[in-house]
């Protein structure tokens, strides 16, 4: 069991993550006190450190299914670990040093579990590069990494892992909330008002494509000159093609019951190619295409809420890179009608660095032997300790 006395002492932790958009390493330096209902997190510093261009290209190629030798895989693993270690060191400049690092690593492959007959299940699989033992060695700081595998080993999806953190940082005594992450892939945490049984009612899952699909489209439409649509301005100048959105929403993933998870394996380059092929008869302009892909993200989120949530939330809080896409935010607000759409900044948690903050908290919990997963979100049969500890 964890020590309540230890949890009262501020724990200075670095949280690190690079998401499915592969746009860089988000690093957050935080001070944590408490554990669950008394959890308090102060963000001291947050910054995104871009990958070197050649490393990003190699990661994206592997995520798209390109074959790679074991030697190349080892080199990539080392290069990512080095980049994460450097980010951890740089974020601490000017501050007292951290005593713990929580590193998610870089996901390059994710396979959800699959039912294999009555009472049987083929376990999922996940691979995050950027090994924690190397980060611990290079920084001299104890590092927790490989967070997803313990949940997967007992039959869960290993995702989403952030809902338990969201529950203790962003819940409200009288209001139900959805925390909607708009990273490469969209995912939600539904958090009911804090009643007697509120923790058991929390749920979460991946809603579908978000930034990664939009970014891939921008790169394709600009022949690589741009990597994203700033503020969604380009998409905002176009008009969505609703018949295409309706067609794309027939994809089986959107109709799978939660818990569920996905990634670039399903919504990556091959899927985008199919989207462009589907759009050919409509002769859409580049702006129209981006507006239509944005509308798919919005429609998949709203469909998820209306189909699978026990009730619509009273408020939605956005986080992740897509929370800065003003056009996407406006379209989501329009679709959700009277449900206010805000960012987690307005609830006191940085929308840009919430995921990095979450992995700092998960590392803090692992150090105190507190489970980090929520079975109602990941589909695991029970709670488990998340992450492997590497002494610094």
Swiss-Prot record:
Coiled coil: none
Gene3D superfamilies recorded: 3.30.420.40
Pathway, per record: Amino-sugar metabolism; 1,6-anhydro-N-acetylmuramate degradation; Cell wall biogenesis; peptidoglycan recycling
Enzyme Commission numbers on file: 2.7.1.170
InterPro entries: Anhydro_N_Ac-Mur_kinase (IPR005338), ATPase_NBD (IPR043129)
GO BP annotation list: 1,6-anhydro-N-acetyl-beta-muramic acid catabolic process; amino sugar metabolic process; peptidoglycan turnover
CDD domains: ASKHA_NBD_ANMK
EC category: transferase
Catalysis: reaction(s): 1,6-anhydro-N-acetyl-beta-muramate + ATP + H2O = N-acetyl-D-muramate 6-phosphate + ADP + H(+)
GO MF assignments: ATP binding; kinase activity; phosphotransferase activity, alcohol group as acceptor
Alphabetical keyword list: ATP-binding, Carbohydrate metabolism, Kinase, Nucleotide-binding, Transferase
Binding site for ATP: 19-26
Top-level division of the source organism's lineage: Bacteria
Similarity section: Belongs to the anhydro-N-acetylmuramic acid kinase family.
Its job: Catalyzes the specific phosphorylation of 1,6-anhydro-N-acetylmuramic acid (anhMurNAc) with the simultaneous cleavage of the 1,6-anhydro ring, generating MurNAc-6-P. Is required for the utilization of anhMurNAc either imported from the medium or derived from its own cell wall murein, and thus plays a role in cell wall recycling.
Protein's name according to its UniProt entry: Anhydro-N-acetylmuramic acid kinase
């Amino acid at each position: 069991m964890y020590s309540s006395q230890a949890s009262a002492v501020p724990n200075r932790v670095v949280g690190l993550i690079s998401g499915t958009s592969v746009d860089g390493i988000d690093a957050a330096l935080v001070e944590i006190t408490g554990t669950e209902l008394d959890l308090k997190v102060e963000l001291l510093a947050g910054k995104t450190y871009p990958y070197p261009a050649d490393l990003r290209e190699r990661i994206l190629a592997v995520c798209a299914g390109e074959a790679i030798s074991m030697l190349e895989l080892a080199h990539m693993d080392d290069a990512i670990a080095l980049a994460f270690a450097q980010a951890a060191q740089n974020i601490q400049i000017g501050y007292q040093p951290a005593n713990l690092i929580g590193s998610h690593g870089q996901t390059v492959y994710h396979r959800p579990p699959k039912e294999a007959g009555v009472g049987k299940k083929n376990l999922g699989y996940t691979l995050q590069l950027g090994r924690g033992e190397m980060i611990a060695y290079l920084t001299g700081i104890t590092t927790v990494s490989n967070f997803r595998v313990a949940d997967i080993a007992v039959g869960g999806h290993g995702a989403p892992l952030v809902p338990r953190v969201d529950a203790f940082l962003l819940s409200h005594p009288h209001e139900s909330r959805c925390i909607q992450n708009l990273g490469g892939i969209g995912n939600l945490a539904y958090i009911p008002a804090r009643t007697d049984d509120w923790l058991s009612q929390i749920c979460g899952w991946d809603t579908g494509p978000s930034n990664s699909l939009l970014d891939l489209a921008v790169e394709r439409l600009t022949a690589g000159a741009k990597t994203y649509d700033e503020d969604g301005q380009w998409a905002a100048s176009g008009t969505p093609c609703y018949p295409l959105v309706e067609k794309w929403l027939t994809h089986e993933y959107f109709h799978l019951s939660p818990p569920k998870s996905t990634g670039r394996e399903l919504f990556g380059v091959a899927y985008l190619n199919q989207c462009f092929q589907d759009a050919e008869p409509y002769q859409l302009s580049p702006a129209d295409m981006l507006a239509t892909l944005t509308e798919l993200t919005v429609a998949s989120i709203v469909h998820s809420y209306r189909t699978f949530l026990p009730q619509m939330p009273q408020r939605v809080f956005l986080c992740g890179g897509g929370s800065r896409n003003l056009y996407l935010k406006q379209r989501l607000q329009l679709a959700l009608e009277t449900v206010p759409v805000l960012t987690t900044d307005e609830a006191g948690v940085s929308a840009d660095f919430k995921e990095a903050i979450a992995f700092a908290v998960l590392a803090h919990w692992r150090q105190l032997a507190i489970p980090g997963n929520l079975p109602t979100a990941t589909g695991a049969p029970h709670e488990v300790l998340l992450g492997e500890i590497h002494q610094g």
